[in-house]
Amino acid sequence: MASHHHHNHNHVCSRHQNHHNNTPQFATSPNCCNKSNHPSPPPAEDNLLHLVATYLQNHQQETQCSCETSCQNFNVIRSQNRVLRQHKNVPREYDQVVLSCLLRKIDDLESSLNKFSSFYDKRRDRHSTLRDSAARVIQTHFRSYLVHRSISFRQLKELAMIKASFLSLKSSVSGKLIFPFKVVSRKATDLLLQLDSIQGRIDPMIRSSKRSLSRDLVRFVQYVDDCVVKRYGFVVKSGSGIKLNGKKPQGFGTSSEDEDNNADMSDDSEEVPVSSIDKRKVASSKSRTGVVIEGDVVKPPVMKFVVLDKNRNVCQVYGNRHDLTSSAEDDSVDGDEETLVMSRDNGRKQSLKARNGVSVKGGGGKTTRVVKTVSFDENGNVCKVYGDTHDLTSSAEDDDSVDVGEETLVMCRDEGKRRSSKTGSRVLVKGSGGKTNRVVKTVSFDENGNVYKAYGDTPESSIISEEDDSTSGSNEGNGEEKGNVNEVEEIKYVPKENESFEEEEEKETDSENEVSSSEGSEGDKRVTKKEVQHQKGSLMFSPPLPLKMEP
């Protein structure tokens, strides 16, 4: 305000000097002084002049001023009056000056503010760049941490899957001497490859887990390889002396056929153990050759193995004590052999011999050996037989025969009890000393060749039909009665194709069954059988049921 007032005062003074120079000088005379002592009243519209005049009139008596002073005051008053009038009529220069000053100051302030703002912006940009870079670095490290953690989680998941597969594979093999070696070895190798595929930056925990799991897998693969070597050596040792029709079978003996043996024991092949009897009492009588021998045979336990090929047909049978032999000139089997599978189809007879052998002979010049697929239950007993692979061999003398249409499937023994799954008409079981036991079975087959019913001579049916009689033993030209020991077993329940069945246990017969009657001029015989059961060391005879006569 002081500067503004000073500026205004200077401006008024300059205007007053200019006006004083332009106006003529008044004469300083007494008349002028008189006139000045009695001034005319100011106009009503001029308030300023009126105030000045009033002030002068009030102080006229008190102060006496000279003429010059009064003239100067009067000139000042007049100049002020003129200035006011000019301000009313003309655009005010004062306002313009003030506005210009204000505008200039505003410009100065803006320029200073712009400089300060530019400096602040530069400083702010510098600080924001550092903050952004720091945030960028933090985000980068955090994202890399998330990536590494996700990789670790994925590797942990893969390790868990590999370990679960390994434990499942190990549990399926543990406690078993025989298993598909190639399948297990290939699966273990695949697990090792999957374990090796876990690479890159690995967490220490994952690294230690991977190391331990790899060590376990390598040990398991070595164990499987050792089992394969042991089994292969056992098979070669057991089959070194085996001959079929004067030739060594495939898969035994020669190095050129080792690959075929391994191919047979491939992924789909199986080795099935079959346990034999510990003790067995054999009651024998006259066979067709007329030899009658009675006695006891004590047989040590023997473990046998049956190897099934891809088509589930029996391709190898071997044990751990004796070799398998088969001669084209003699179809009989040694006393220590036992027949696993006996089959016959369309007038051709077949046999696959192992231990405690079974001999089936016919009247043809050739026999057809049919290998049946054998399925065993948990106890090592036969539960299913199927398949029809043929093998032509030459036959020898036909002392004993099985009629056309018969099919002898399986004979097995367990713990002194005779088990027979299914037979066609009869099977000759030969032990040591030429003793024979005849077992007669009636078998019904379905369309697929599977057995769905098997039964024998039970107390409910004491007489066998003529067809079974002709099958069981007709001998032309021989009128003598022969004491044949016929064992009859009843199978009350035979399951279907996909079910395993358990056969009823029957006790052995210790004495001969009497065979009496001969019919007709043709020499056919009707055999009436009597069962002799051995219970608690005493003989109990069950007579046949009486025949019902139709009216």
From Swiss-Prot:
Instruction: Locate the compositionally biased regions of type Polar residues.
Output: 20-38
Sequence ranges of Basic and acidic residues compositional bias: 479-499, 522-534
Q: Which residues form a coiled coil?
A: none
In chain numbering, the transit peptide falls at: 1-52
User: Subunit info?
Assistant: Binds to the ATPase domain of HSP70/HSC70 chaperones.
Residue span of region Disordered = 1-46, 246-281, 414-433, 450-551
User: So what does this one do?
Assistant: Co-chaperone that regulates diverse cellular pathways, such as programmed cell death and stress responses.
Q: What is this protein called?
A: BAG family molecular chaperone regulator 8, chloroplastic
Q: Where is the composition biased (Basic residues)?
A: 1-19
IQ domain: from which residue to which, for each copy? 131-160
Q: Which residues carry this modification: Phosphoserine?
A: 332
The family database entries (InterPro entries) matched by this protein are listed as: BAG5/6/7/8
